[in-house]
Amino acid sequence: MTNNLPPGTPAPANPELLLELLRYPMPFGKYKGRLLRELPTYYLEWFAKKGFPPGKLGMLLQTLYEIRINGLDYLLDELAKRR
């Protein structure tokens, strides 16, 4: 399925992706077992500098990083309240 958005237009947000940020645990490292949403911003900044891991985890961490640096945490807060 292709979208009809002009080039350079970001894709619409996937609500399932946001829900995964609420329930996906960090699988390794200092914060192993903590939900991604609970990770401190400095940890996400470190990944942004060093490189996000490949695959789904990296995509989720990068999404969370973008949410944080753009002040969009309220999106996750609202979703968490509705759960």
Spans of model-derived segments:
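DEDD superfamily 3′-5′ metal-dependent exonuclease/proofreading module
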Residues: M1-R83
